[in-house]
């Protein structure tokens, strides 16, 4: 075989753009996982929600995963329902949970965010 023929034979195909429906399906699947985590937290109740408890860690994962979704460029077209103020609050809460530690977290505000505010955001995202 000639060198030119080998190059053409093994040339990579151009990447195809992922379909928007595939992105939407992936987003919906992740939103369902976040919702399931919220249900776990809510089912245990506020009295069992504090640093050191499993539900507190699950709630942190809710915020971490939601913040990650907001940072993914392929999901950006679907994120119009999330206000800039909400995005900032989610990022700030994620940073406290992931980097600063729970001691600086206000448990009452964190409970409210995970059990009321985030579900409202998820409802808006699912409606799009």
What are these regions (language model features)?
Residues 2-128:
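Solvent-exposed interaction patches of small proteins and small membrane subunits
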């Amino acid at each position: 075989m000639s060198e030119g023929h080998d190059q053409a034979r093994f040339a990579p195909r151009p990447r195809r753009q992922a379909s928007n429906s595939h992105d939407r399906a992936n987003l919906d699947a992740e939103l369902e996982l976040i919702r399931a985590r919220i249900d776990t937290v809510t089912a245990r109740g506020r009295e069992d929600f504090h640093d050191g408890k499993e539900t507190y860690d699950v709630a942190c994962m809710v915020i971490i995963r939601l913040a990650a979704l907001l940072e993914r460029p392929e999901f950006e077209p679907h994120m119009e329902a999330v206000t800039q103020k909400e995005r900032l609050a989610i990022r700030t809460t994620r940073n406290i949970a992931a980097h600063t530690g729970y001691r600086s977290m206000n448990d009452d505000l964190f409970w409210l965010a995970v059990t009321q505010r985030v579900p409202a955001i998820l409802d808006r995202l699912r409606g799009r």
